[in-house]
Amino acid sequence: MPRDIIILECTEAKAEGKPTSRYVTTRNKKSLRTPGRLEKIKYNPFLKRRTLHREMR
């Protein structure tokens, strides 16, 4: 199955006006489990805590 390369960007740092952290990952193109944007809790080194990262388009 083909996979897409996606970028996850921190949502909390953007709201606070600090540098955003970004992660690169892959996802299945035709996944029925995650039809919308992917969201994961990842570590943000600028905020020094785990934050919500959302898929960019």
Curated annotation (Swiss-Prot):
GO terms for molecular function: structural constituent of ribosome. Keywords: Ribonucleoprotein, Ribosomal protein. The keyword Acetylation does not apply. InterPro entries: Ribosomal_bL33, Ribosomal_bL33_sf, Ribosomal_zn-bd. One of its GO terms (biological process) is translation. Pfam families: Ribosomal_L33. GO terms for cellular component: cytoplasm; ribonucleoprotein complex; ribosome. Belongs to the bacterial ribosomal protein bL33 family. This is Large ribosomal subunit protein bL33. The gene is rpmG.
